[in-house]
């Protein structure tokens, strides 16, 4: 959530910055809500002052033995008016909060302006695209003999699911373990095991709710008893779309000791996404699934360190690609292609030979204080006043897409897969992965 004071100070400037994100700020609605809020607060203060005056007058009259009935009647009416005003103010503040919840983050000044992904800025290219002297296969054809099975997954669950068996399941597990170990041992992250289902407050904290509910898998749970309408009481849980949600929420409603910052967490979880807006896209293979594994990096920092932390976190994700010997490029997203809560984002795109294209394998973002304000996540130095933290997150990496890139880039003429040296210890020293 952006700072409401920015809207109150210079709403035109905020409107202009949001327009670069293709977001049209409803200035009229905010001004209407804000005008009523100010009016109610002013009226409440006036009534409070009047009530205080009447209380003194009533006390003086009673002290003198005089009749204070008129003043008491007026004070009673003021109490009624104040209760009514407080009720309306509470509703109004909730409406303002809902309005603010729907506004995306403001882009950092270093982010290039642009309408969509065609105007993103390539900032780095690493590695050489492999040259093959045989007709290459895509990961679906390569993966079949290695244990990749979409047919049985469709029978069990439907489209956009996969079953991994045998050699390819082992490779998938090895990739995740390699990523976790590298980040925990060499990059200084604390490993976290977190819930795969979270409550609505956690989803609101990181920005998935209310805007992106259709992209989530909701799991209602009956709590027992009935609500006021006679319906069974239920509580909604959500399957996590990314470990960013539970891990970032570790600091929700907390005041962190400044001396402990930065906090650096890594988690390996399955991720669940409905892909509501992706009909017809990437229908073949593992690129876009309802369930996929990801190793997620999260950093919690002081405001003055967040941009430096973004470079560091992105570098940690890049290191995984380099150790896996996978060609990639690093792209700075323009304002029109950024995620809802991001103030600055780098995408890492890995080379996929069968598509003759780079495909996203990691997105690394600084959220500034956007999530922290929603979560009331703060830090405190000494006897100072609590301040909002800055939060960052990134994939380090998406395991399924790493698997796709690895078997396609490292394929051999006989259908076996050359294993990068860094990954060999996780596969018992295997140099090549062969079909059963």
Swiss-Prot record:
HAMAP family: Ser_tRNA_synth_type1. Pathway: Aminoacyl-tRNA biosynthesis; selenocysteinyl-tRNA(Sec) biosynthesis; L-seryl-tRNA(Sec) from L-serine and tRNA(Sec): step 1/1. It is an enzyme of class 6 (ligase). Pfam families: Seryl_tRNA_N, tRNA-synt_2b. Keywords: Aminoacyl-tRNA synthetase, ATP-binding, Cytoplasm, Ligase, Nucleotide-binding, Protein biosynthesis. Catalyzes the attachment of serine to tRNA(Ser). Is also able to aminoacylate tRNA(Sec) with serine, to form the misacylated tRNA L-seryl-tRNA(Sec), which will be further converted into selenocysteinyl-tRNA(Sec). L-serine binds at residues 242-244, 296, 395. Belongs to the class-II aminoacyl-tRNA synthetase family. Type-1 seryl-tRNA synthetase subfamily. This is Serine--tRNA ligase. GO terms for cellular component: cytoplasm. The keyword Cytoplasm applies. Its EC number is 6.1.1.11. InterPro entries: aa-tRNA-synt_IIb, aa-tRNA-synth_II, aa-tRNA-synth_II/BPL/LPL, Ser-tRNA-ligase_type_1, Ser-tRNA-synth_1_N, SerRS_1_N_sf, SerRS_core, tRNA-bd_arm. It is found in: Cytoplasm. Homodimer. The tRNA molecule binds across the dimer. The gene is serS. CDD domains: SerRS_core (cd00770). GO terms for biological process: selenocysteine biosynthetic process; seryl-tRNA aminoacylation. Consists of two distinct domains, a catalytic core and a N-terminal extension that is involved in tRNA binding. ATP binds at residues 273-275, 360-363. It catalyses: tRNA(Ser) + L-serine + ATP = L-seryl-tRNA(Ser) + AMP + diphosphate + H(+); tRNA(Sec) + L-serine + ATP = L-seryl-tRNA(Sec) + AMP + diphosphate + H(+). One of its GO terms (molecular function) is serine-tRNA ligase activity.
